[in-house]
Amino acid sequence: DKTTDMVFYVESEEEVTELIRLAEEYDVCLIPFGGGTSVSSALKLPDLETRMIVAVDIRRMNKIEWINADDRRACIQAGITGKQMEEELAQHGYMVGHEPDSVEFSTLGGWIATQASGMKKNRYGNIEDIIENITVITPRGILEQTEPTTRVSMGMRPQNLLFGSEGNLGIITKAVVRIHQLPEVQEYASAVFPTWDRGVDFLHDLSRTNYVPASVRLVDNIQFRFGQALKPHPEGLKKVMASLQKFVVLNLKGLDPYKMCAATFVMEGEAREVAYQKQNLLQLAKQHQGIAAGPENGKRGYMLTFAIAYIRDFLSNYHIIGETMETSVPWSKISEVCQVATDKLLELHDKHNIPGRPYLSCRIPQIYHTGVCIYFMFGMYMKGID
């Protein structure tokens, strides 16, 4: 594989401007780099590129330039990570609420360039809903709005071209984002369903209500069992309660441990709002044969999300290669897409004579009016495979 010839660490817009000028003068290819968490191969260097390639690391441009509490806006440099941004805003009582799985390492500029979506988009929106102004430096100058605007109804907004641009139009240096006051209450909840299809039906009905929580996720049976296997061994009273809960679910309710799936929820806002959401969504789950599984399981499910990348890196030491992929699917095609993806992976696994059996699981991390996002995780044992 090709590698970059040089890496530049920029600390200001002046340095970015000068670097772009030099790149144009000497015919050098620049590739912006943020957290490096992209899974779309956008950072893979083009095989046919013959120019010198320079990676431009923007992570030193990581400051919050200003906060406007009255208008609930903040101007933030593009190299800041999600984790740092939320920690610094929280010191002033604010948050952005954009929380992709990669929030620990991914950057604001990267979110814009990849048109990212966060797990709490139901409450705070996707990145295109959060951003009100973008500053991007191009070979022909700086592109930005004169002032951030709440909404524009006349003419085109050039900044909209930057969402999903993957660094092809210039280097994003900062953005004005919408901020929110820290929520009064944050609660987790969870529910288990007898089958994946039951869980999907629940999500479909939930999407048509007025009590959709900040985040809702549905994991299939394989991912559910994987999460259960990683749970710490309970002791004392927790051990008794865990055994009792397991007895109720498997014996009294009759759920099959090899078919059941689980949904997890995050609710944020005022206490009354959160209580309303929790009561109604668990009642709806019950109508779909769902069983409330408690806040701790909900919280653990979300914590596992952030641990997956570390688990993947750990398993690579033992020749197990893991990866993820996701796609948007209309409600009517969910089961079909999951089945086709499973069949295709098994087919390719056999075709290339890879040992063992692949791990493949899926989850629905986001719901929309017309469909969902399906997130696939797979792993294969690759020892001895070139």
Segments the model singles out, each with a brief description of its role:
Residues 1, 200-386:
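C-terminal substrate-recognition/cap domain of FAD-linked oxidoreductases
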Residues 1-59:
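Glycine-rich N-terminal segment of FAD-binding domains in flavoprotein oxidoreductases
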Residues 2-4, 68-71, 182-187, 259, ...:
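Short glycine-enriched loop/turn motifs at secondary-structure junctions
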Residues 5-11, 179, 187-194, 265-267, ...:
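Short, well-ordered beta-strand elements within core beta-sheets of diverse protein domains
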Residues 39-41, 105-109, 224-225, 245:
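Beta-rich nucleic-acid/ligand-interaction surfaces
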Residues 62-219, 231:
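FAD-binding subdomain of flavoenzyme oxidoreductases
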